[in-house]
């Protein structure tokens, strides 16, 4: 099953547009887990088990594992998700971007070592830095387009004088993902929930590609505005929330609290569909 097939199945089965981001910070862990980096897997696995029936995808952020020398725990978590939530696609949030030969190795890391269904990428180095990922049939790749952070406009909001119409950089990336770069229909775009007007513009330029939309919850993005700007019946959106769900409680009931927060967010997203 391809990434897009898996995504469509999860959306239908779970009635959800919600992606839960797995950004483990041991200092924020509850109770007996607090401060213990050796328990990253335990924390994340409980979040996964509590929310698997409510999501369209999971999105582990690789830096939160690598910073604690926990790559082996990430491998263990990926296996746990394949075994216990086999119908839910996993997007490895790595934001890689490098020359072709190095990109080939990063693609192997994402799709073979970790077994991810999709990965996030920076398109700044051009198509030859993206192409190695597209050789992995059935896998997905999300290009950073209009990101949720305030500094994103430093580059993404600048106009390209050398291109007809002088589009903003993020608009150019959207067109590339919809057209010439999307050779096998594997590309998607990352567009922040904090910029609903830009989500709407990206959807106009890229009407069929999936949008990964972070920024709902702790970053302040509005769920209703996000869905209304980006959702179309024939074009998937994946709305990510991380901290607001995984740290919904600092007590021993953290998994139950995460489930409650995920259900509330999922229902709000579904209700916002026009």
From Swiss-Prot:
The active site is at residue 95. PROSITE patterns: OMPDECASE. Belongs to the OMP decarboxylase family. Type 2 subfamily. SMART domains: OMPdecase (SM00934). Pathway: Pyrimidine metabolism; UMP biosynthesis via de novo pathway; UMP from orotate: step 2/2. This is Orotidine 5'-phosphate decarboxylase. It holds the Pfam family OMPdecase. CDD domains: OMP_decarboxylase_like. Its EC number is 4.1.1.23. It catalyses: orotidine 5'-phosphate + H(+) = UMP + CO2. Keywords: Decarboxylase, Lyase, Pyrimidine biosynthesis. The keyword Cytoplasm does not apply. It comes from Variovorax paradoxus (strain S110). GO terms for molecular function: orotidine-5'-phosphate decarboxylase activity. GO terms for biological process: 'de novo' pyrimidine nucleobase biosynthetic process; 'de novo' UMP biosynthetic process.
């Amino acid at each position: 099953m391809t990434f897009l097939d898996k995504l469509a199945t999860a959306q239908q089965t779970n009635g959800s547009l919600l992606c839960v981001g797995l950004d483990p910070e041991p200092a924020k862990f509850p109770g007996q887990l607090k401060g213990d980096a050796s328990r990253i897997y335990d924390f994340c696995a409980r979040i996964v088990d509590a929310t698997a029936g409510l999501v369209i995808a999971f999105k582990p952020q690789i830096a939160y594992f690598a910073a604690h020398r926990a790559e082996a725990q990430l491998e263990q978590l990926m296996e746990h998700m394949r075994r216990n939530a086999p119908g839910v696609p996993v997007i490895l949030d790595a934001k890689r971007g490098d020359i072709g030969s190095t990109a080939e190795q990063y693609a192997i890391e994402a799709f073979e070592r970790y077994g991810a269904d999709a990965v996030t990428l920076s398109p700044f180095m051009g198509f030859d830095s993206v192409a190695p990922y597209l050789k992995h049939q059935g896998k997905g790749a999300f290009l950073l387009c209009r990101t949720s952070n305030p500094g994103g406009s430093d580059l993404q909001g600048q106009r390209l004088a050398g291109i007809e119409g002088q589009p903003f950089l993020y608009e150019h990336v959207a067109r590339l993902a919809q057209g010439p770069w999307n050779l096998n229909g594997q590309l998607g775009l990352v567009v922040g929930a904090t910029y609903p007007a830009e989500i709407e513009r990206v959807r106009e330029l890229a009407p069929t590609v999936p949008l990964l939309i972070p920024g709902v919850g702790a970053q302040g993005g509005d769920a209703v505005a996000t869905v209304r700007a980006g959702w179309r019946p024939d074009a998937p959106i994946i709305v990510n929330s991380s901290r607001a769900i995984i740290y919904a409680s600092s007590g021993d009931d953290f998994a139950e609290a995460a489930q409650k927060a995920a259900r509330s967010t999922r229902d709000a997203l579904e209700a916002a569909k026009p």
